[in-house]
């Protein structure tokens, strides 16, 4: 049994076709797509057993098989996986003398599998020694492997590290700051696990397609300076200058891959680069008073007891959305978010379960979107 769907809606030249037996990993796959599109190292954080490495390997297979010609040899040669602990030596990163060439050709050279790999996975990086971490920095930042006089270019297209947690005493360490893309991989809920059993358990397969925007496609997204100023108000004291230089490009890529408005992309970027609290603070700053008022009315739908009360409230919200969209106060991304919130509330509302008509909302939002300014 399998399910095929597209994670991203926008058209891109590059597409990854992912097949996985994992469930509820769409956000992780999007993060890996973001890492590939931006060329930034990604850190996956989560408890043992949440399938951090398996998710990366499923994505790696999709990347290696993008032309449909992947072989077992490709998988073995183009992926470098390092399991680190306190005893792992820096030579695992820096490379070791190639004894074969030394004895057969009397030639000294380094065997550097990490430099040759197209996908690099460093597991349990929180347990790595300072020597390992220092050796990683050049590979991560400059894409060069430094070993004495040797400076070897690295070929990686996707660099992912995993850890159980970032040690509290190291949260402000420059090493962790190098991972601008951070994502927490959570456990699957008990309810979702039951659904997984009903779908066939370990025999179940999900298939995704996810678009990978190139530089030109990313730059199609326009982020007004006024919105970046709001980001700076929240993020400046939490980020290094180096990290802040990536905010515009990263936010554009987020907008593209998640197919969300610029405001939502900036909020998600803050969540990725800083934390959830920063994202919530930025969301509050980016919302105009008018949009906040509409969102508040949407949340109030929970409190109504009868279908008649809901109908009146919906009509009021629809009127406000039309007015604000016409005046350019609300963009299509915000309208879409309101639509999704309303549909979710109405589909689960006791007074509306037997009466909900999603078509009326979809028709309204479609009409409004055609008349509202394009946020991109």
What are these regions (language model features)?
Residues 80-104:
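Conserved NTP-binding/hydrolysis module of P-loop NTPases
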Residues 33-85:
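Walker A/P-loop
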Residues 48-54, 257-376:
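C-terminal engagement/docking regions of AAA+ P-loop ATPases
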Residues 63-69, 100-104, 119-132, 138-213:
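Canonical AAA+ ATPase core
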Residues 30-35, 99-120:
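Conserved alpha-helical scaffold flanking the Walker A/P-loop in AAA+ ATPase domains
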Residues 24, 32, 44, 93, ...:
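Conserved RecA-like P-loop NTPase ATPase core
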Residues 189, 200-288:
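Basic, amphipathic alpha-helical bundle interface domains used for macromolecular binding and assembly
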Residues 4-48:
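Pre-Walker A (pre-P-loop) alpha-helix and adjacent loop at the N terminus of AAA/AAA+ ATPase modules
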